[in-house]
Amino acid sequence: MHLFKWLAPKKKVAEGLVMRISTADQVDYATITDPSDSDIWDALVQVPVSYDSLYLTYSEKGSMSFIFVESEDDKYRLEHDTPELGLELTNVARVSQQVARDILIRFSKEHTVILDLHWKQEKVR
């Protein structure tokens, strides 16, 4: 099995849009619903290699808030937006507010990152 497995999206009324990433060989419900921080970081590392972009939703289940990470000309663009996420998207993982903040801080230190206005304000906090 390929280490980075994007799981197909599933719609659940109770949870809203459910899309998860897992690097685990054995995929079970816990892996799908609660990816580890290392899974998220591993996925981010793969963005310029295997994927053009990655969406990370955060905060409460069903929340439309997310981080959009895109690799472009050897730079990363981190955006915060609230579009309708279609079911055709499979590169989405839900993370906690803290992990979202960690991504902003740590990823910005390690890479050339272009931030939108929302994340510039978040970085100041």
What are these regions (language model features)?
Residues 2-35, 41-125:
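Acidic, proline/glycine-rich low-complexity IDRs
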